[in-house]
Amino acid sequence: MLAPKPIELPADPAAGKDLLADDTALAHPDSPAVWAARAERELSVGDKLIAYAYARTGYHRSLDRLRANGWKGWGPVPASHEPNQGVLKAIAMLALASKAIGDQAEYD
């Protein structure tokens, strides 16, 4: 079976906006980049539970975005394509937040 083509997402809905602003999150709850940025901020100040909640939201928004753009659950999502970076960061933040709350199974 041939591998699928790499997914190249369109621009993140919150691209160019302040990802940490409440107004941005309220206007663009479908933005993985918003939730990834919020998770990263909360981890940096030690609020592991809130970081995990933001990261989990970002992960699910990422899956929604990938599937809406033809991803079938496998195949490359290159970080070199800038609009993919919010999705990839959201997935990475879930791993980091999971580790922070002691959920090793989710981290692995």
Region locations from a protein language model:
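Start-of-helix signal in alpha-solenoid helical-repeat scaffolds, especially tetratricopeptide repeats
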Residues: 32, 81-88
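N-terminal alpha-helical interaction modules that lie
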Residues: 1-73, 91-92, 96-108
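Acidic, Ser/Thr- and Gly/Pro-rich intrinsically disordered linkers and low-complexity segments
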Residues: 71-81
